[in-house]
A protein has these predicted regions:
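Short, flexible coil/linker elements and helix-boundary hinge sites characteristic
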Residues: 16, 36-39, 87-90, 135, ...
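Amphipathic alpha-helical scaffolding segments comprising HEAT/armadillo-like alpha-solenoid repeats
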Residues: 2-12, 42-61, 85-99, 121-133, ...
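Helix-loop junctions that connect tandem helical modules in alpha-solenoid scaffolds
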Residues: 10-24, 58-69, 97-112, 134-142, ...
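Non-membrane alpha-helical secondary structure
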Residues: 3, 7, 21, 50, ...
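Conserved binding-pocket/active-site segment within a compact domain
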Residues: 101-178
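Amphipathic alpha-helical elements of HEAT/ARM-like alpha-solenoid repeat scaffolds that form extended
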Residues: 25-44, 70-83, 108-120, 143-158, ...
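N-terminal "cap/leader" segments of large eukaryotic alpha-helical scaffolds
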Residues: 1-34, 205-210
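Eukaryotic acidic, Ser/Thr-rich intrinsically disordered low-complexity regions
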Residues: 4, 166-210
Length: 210
């Protein structure tokens, strides 16, 4: 473990001094770093992977090499897992970087995996439109599963979902189970979510009529 910590510390130090490296070397450094927040969780990594200044450096690298898709994917994956798994508190600058990356092909899939873990996400004005757009992100088979997970997460919090959004969610999920071959277990799982959304919709209509 000490050896792994030393490797991570060395990578962090290099990322702090990222302007000293060319794009090719930096891509290799970023690729090696990304494995740490993504792979097996370790409390020994917490001091480094909750470093807010390190996250700011990663954003700066991403903005500087905005056409390097491979580097951007590793940056988004790194920050996303730092926020989700290691509870890094991201600045608004970091969240804005994620929002900007929702329009980038290939990169946007990795954004969708962890953006809802950001504390700023719940107050983002476009969050509902974004949620509805997730199934259209390539690879679509993985994105619909991610979308379903996000819907279940929202339902578990008992947060009120706007009526029109609930209708959209129902349409997407019903269309998916009607056009896709899946196991009985998965069908039951999706039907359970659909039932909860229908209950949510009924409750919303009842509240409006009162």
């Amino acid at each position: 473990m000490q050896q792994k910590i030393k490797i991570l510390e060395d990578l962090r130090d290099k990322l702090y001094l990222w302007k000293s490296y060319n794009e090719e070397d930096l891509e290799k450094i970023m690729s090696a770093f990304e494995k740490f927040p993504r792979k097996e969780f370790s409390t020994f990594y917490i001091p480094i992977l909750t470093d807010t200044l390190l996250a700011e450096h990663l954003v700066a690298i991403g903005k500087t090499f905005s056409t390097n898709t491979c580097m951007l994917i590793n940056i988004i994956s790194s920050i996303g897992n730092m926020v989700w798994r290691y509870k890094l508190y991201p600045s608004d600058k970091v969240f804005n970087f994620f929002k900007e990356s929702t329009t980038l092909k290939k990169v946007n899939y990795y954004v969708s995996l962890n953006i809802s873990s950001f504390p700023q996400y719940s107050s983002w004005e476009e969050r509902w439109d974004y949620l509805i757009s997730i199934p259209n992100i390539s690879p679509k088979r993985k994105s619909i599963e991610n979308f379903h997970t996000e819907v279940k997460k929202i339902l578990s919090t008992k947060e009120k979902i706007p009526i029109q959004v609930t209708k959209e969610l129902l349409t997407i999920l019903k269309n998916y189970i009607n056009t896709t071959k899946m196991s009985d277990y998965l069908i039951e799982n999706y039907l359970n979510t659909i039932h909860k959304l229908e209950q949510e919709l009924k409750y919303s209509y009842d509240s409006v009529s009162l």
